[in-house]
Amino acid sequence: MRKDTPPPLVPPAAREWNLPPNAPACMERQLEAARYRSDGSLLLGVSSLSGRCWVGSLWFFKDPSAAPNEGFCSAGVQTEAGVADLTWVGDKGILVASDSGAVELWELDENETLIVSKFCKYEHDDIVSTVTVLSSGTQAVSGSKDCCIKIWDLAQQVSLNSYRAHAGQVTCVAASPHKDSVFLSCSEDSRILLWDTRCPKPASQMACNASGYLPTALAWHPQQSEVFVFGDENGSVSLVDTKNASCTLSSAVHSQGVTRLVFSPHSVPLLTSLSEDCSLAVLDSSLSEVFRSRAHRDFVRDATWSPLNHSLLTTVGWDHQVIHHVVPLEPLPNPGPDSVVE
């Protein structure tokens, strides 16, 4: 098992400092979120969690190796509060969960040199902790510390439904990549709910959390439509089949709580698990560890797999580092006598 991490990629020496219009002069300390776009561009969500003003910002890098150097970004914008979570909406839209209680939609404009606001809706009563876009791309889900979950119509810029199915703060929502009306949520009430917005009573409780520890992170399996994973406050990761939720595969991965779970784009996906123990682990389909890194010196907050190089995993953290890890992949099997190579 490999545990070493290569040094971050170094921006080319010939690159010139060129801060785009409307971008903040300085990036805040805490890197909260990172998402690759399909073309390999990198989006960062950043917060300032110290000082008199808790502000945040969004940064778009066409060259991910330049992040987090603000002078080499392609576009950037200040937000009025910290960024708790974000996700792409297509190739131009950016959906943001704000510490202010707002759900925000931003969009790249002017040849991707500006990030402009499309809407900002204050309909939650506390920090919006998590957002996800349903597979249709036209609707989104937000979860908040006000214990509420909201469904959004992105084109109409309105919330369609508001649900108080949880009795505790909502920590994660995760849209199914297979069905455009299905998503998961978990909360500090210890419950994981499976949602189908087509149903009169859309939420059903999953009986998969026998440990009693609070679930803290969720992710759908990208290829198996009935399978998801969740992490808990004790550092364990569990694999669940929604058709037989009482039978789960679990592994003690971290010494502290799991904060994020991200699947890779491989045909047999790897799973990245992030934790409050400041480490990241990459797990195979049996939840066995294939890679671990402790390169971050503070909480590691998000991870995103490169769509162009499937062995490249990028993480960000409160130590203001963007680290590009090369994850060892299993070697391809030798071609058999019946194999044909074109």
Curated annotation (Swiss-Prot):
Keywords: Cytoplasm, Nucleus, Phosphoprotein, Repeat, Ubl conjugation pathway, WD repeat. The keyword Nucleus applies. GO terms for molecular function: methyl-CpG binding; transcription coactivator activity; ubiquitin-like ligase-substrate adaptor activity. WD repeats lie at residues 22-75, 78-116, 123-162, 165-205, 209-250, 253-293, 295-330. GO terms for biological process: epithelial cell proliferation involved in prostate gland development; negative regulation of cell population proliferation; negative regulation of epithelial cell proliferation involved in prostate gland development; positive regulation of cell population proliferation; positive regulation of mRNA splicing, via spliceosome; protein polyubiquitination; regulation of transcription by RNA polymerase II; secretory columnal luminar epithelial cell differentiation involved in prostate glandular acinus development. Pfam families: WD40. SMART domains: WD40 (SM00320). It comes from the Eukaryota. GO terms for cellular component: Cul4B-RING E3 ubiquitin ligase complex; cytoplasm; cytosol; Golgi apparatus; methylosome; nucleoplasm; nucleus. Its main location: nucleus. Disulfide bonds: none annotated. The modification Phosphothreonine is found at residue 5. InterPro entries: Methylosome_Comp_WDR77, WD40/YVTN_repeat-like_dom_sf, WD40_repeat_CS, WD40_repeat_dom_sf, WD40_rpt. Component of the methylosome complex composed of PRMT5, WDR77 and CLNS1A. Found in a complex composed of PRMT5, WDR77 and RIOK1. RIOK1 and CLNS1A bound directly to PRMT5 at the same binding site, in a mutually exclusive manner, which allows the recruitment of distinct methylation substrates, such as nucleolin/NCL and Sm proteins, respectively. Found in a complex with the component of the methylosome, PRMT5, CLNS1A, WDR77, PRMT1 and ERH. Directly interacts with PRMT5, as well as with several Sm proteins, including SNRPB and SNRPD2 and, more weakly, SNRPD3 and SNRPE. Non-catalytic component of the methylosome complex, composed of PRMT5, WDR77 and CLNS1A, which modifies specific arginines to dimethylarginines in several spliceosomal Sm proteins and histones. This modification targets Sm proteins to the survival of motor neurons (SMN) complex for assembly into small nuclear ribonucleoprotein core particles. Might play a role in transcription regulation. Substrate-recognition component of the DCX(WDR77) complex, which mediates ubiquitination and degradation of Irgm1 in intestinal cells. PANTHER family: METHYLOSOME PROTEIN 50, METHYLOSOME PROTEIN WDR77. This is Methylosome protein WDR77.
